[in-house]
């Protein structure tokens, strides 16, 4: 479940991706150490970077991302960041810009057809496990709406605990609480099944044991445990 940067390097080197669209959070991309690693890794690839500017995933910025992806025509989208970055990438890979997009989102009626290209995600927070879920969130006029489709599932994800450790405590705290809340919600949901209950129970056990130490003294061990807890919660 846990990866190393060498796993990402092997993935990029062993595939025929020539054009890579990188979607990331401007601050987290730098502070996590991802910027240095990926600039070297992608040095011989044609890349386009898009830095997320809105704290929440909003329709206006989503449209800009879709427009940038369609004009660049990548064969891989690489999402490196927290839940908002990953949700943006998941949605942008399956949604087209159209005049009635806002109405379709609000009415939960977007006609999903296919993915635009391959999507790989690397979380820089340990939160709701967006890398393994088939749903994503977008805000329209300040109101939260959800997309849900199997097409939203990323094709690949990589859990790199080292990328989590330098996040601000406020980010670590809210993301970790997200993982705990998601696991609790799964345990009491009427839609839960034996497998989801098993994953949620494991997630809760790990996160409760590691959450406080991850905030007070982040290290590779508790960052790894929170990565696992987040992934299981998703």
What annotation goes with each model-predicted range?
Residues 62-74, 162, 219-234:
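Short, hydrophobic/aliphatic alpha-helical segments
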């Amino acid at each position: 479940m846990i990866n190393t940067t060498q796993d990402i390097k092997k993935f990029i080197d062993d595939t025929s991706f020539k054009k890579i669209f990188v979607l990331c959070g401007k601050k987290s991309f730098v502070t996590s150490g991802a910027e240095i690693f990926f600039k070297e890794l992608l040095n011989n690839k044609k890349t386009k970077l898009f830095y997320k500017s809105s704290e929440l995933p909003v329709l206006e910025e989503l449209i800009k991302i879709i427009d940038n992806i369609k004009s660049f025509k990548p064969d891989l989208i690489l999402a490196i960041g927290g839940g908002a970055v990953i949700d943006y990438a998941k949605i942008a890979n399956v949604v087209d810009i159209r005049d009635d997009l806002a109405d379709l989102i609000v009415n939960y009626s977007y006609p999903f057809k296919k993915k635009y290209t391959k999507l790989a995600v690397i979380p820089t927070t340990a939160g709701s496990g967006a890398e393994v879920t088939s749903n994503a969130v977008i805000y329209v006029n300040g109101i939260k709406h959800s997309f849900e489709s199997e097409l939203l599932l990323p094709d690949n994800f990589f859990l790199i605990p080292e990328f989590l450790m330098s996040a601000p405590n406020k980010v670590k705290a809210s993301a970790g609480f997200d993982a705990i809340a998601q696991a609790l919600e799964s345990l009491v949901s009427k839609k839960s099944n034996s497998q989801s209950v098993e994953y949620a129970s494991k997630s809760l056990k790990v996160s409760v044991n590691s959450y406080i130490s991850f905030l007070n003294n982040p290290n590779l061990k508790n960052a790894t445990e929170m990565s696992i807890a987040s992934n299981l919660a998703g």
